[in-house]
A protein has these predicted regions:
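Compositionally biased terminal segments of proteins
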Residues: 1-186
Length: 186
């Protein structure tokens, strides 16, 4: 890799780490999923946005909104951020607008984006049970398990080439891990 091609990765990493640390510092209960989780599992791919499942318990959702304010991230859609505090409004977004995520971003730095999952299948409660813990800059964050990521990628419609590629990569990693475990027991 040449020096110039690695520069965006540094920028990408720093804004993602900044967001993860802010969520942790605000004591937000969340699980990282999507492309960032893929990278954290060892899959080589590029991603700029951060996909998260956040517990939408009222106090936790308020801490999440406070973190978004401190990060200067605002809703991408022309609706108030506080909509995530109301479960009926979330249900209406999913039902009426077919919304899968609620996006917060910076209009000045559009690569600084976080997608909050809205659907039950990608909820915090669904992903947290077998999430693994990862230390980042003195904090511990939860990352969706490979199995959950495979399930999530398998449900995407329409099927996208990157999701098929991600499923293959995760399956290969799981196979290598099983093979290595088998060798260490022998």
């Amino acid at each position: 890799m040449s020096g110039s091609s690695s520069l965006p990765v540094v920028s990408q990493e720093s804004h993602l780490v900044e967001i993860l640390c802010a969520l942790s510092d605000h004591h937000v209960d969340f699980v990282v999923a999507g492309g960032v989780a893929m990278v954290l599992h060892g899959v080589e791919r590029t991603t700029l946005d951060l996909d998260v499942a956040v517990s939408l318990e009222p106090d936790n959702a308020r801490r999440f909104l406070e973190a978004m304010t401190n990060l200067r991230l605002a809703p991408r859609a022309p609706v108030p951020a506080e909509i995530i505090l109301d479960q009926e409004s979330i249900t209406a977004l999913v039902r009426e607008k077919n919304a899968l995520v609620f996006t917060f971003w910076s209009a000045q730095e559009p690569y600084r984006q976080i997608d909050l999952f809205l659907t039950r299948e990608n909820s915090f409660d669904d992903l947290v049970a077998d999430a693994y813990l990862l230390p980042i800059r003195g904090r511990v964050i939860r990352v969706a398990s490979r199995g959950k990521l495979i399930e999530m990628k398998s449900r995407v419609r329409p099927v996208r080439a990157k999701d098929i590629s991600d499923i293959r990569a995760l399956t290969e990693l799981e196979k290598k891990e099983r093979d290595n475990e088998g060798r260490t027991r022998d």
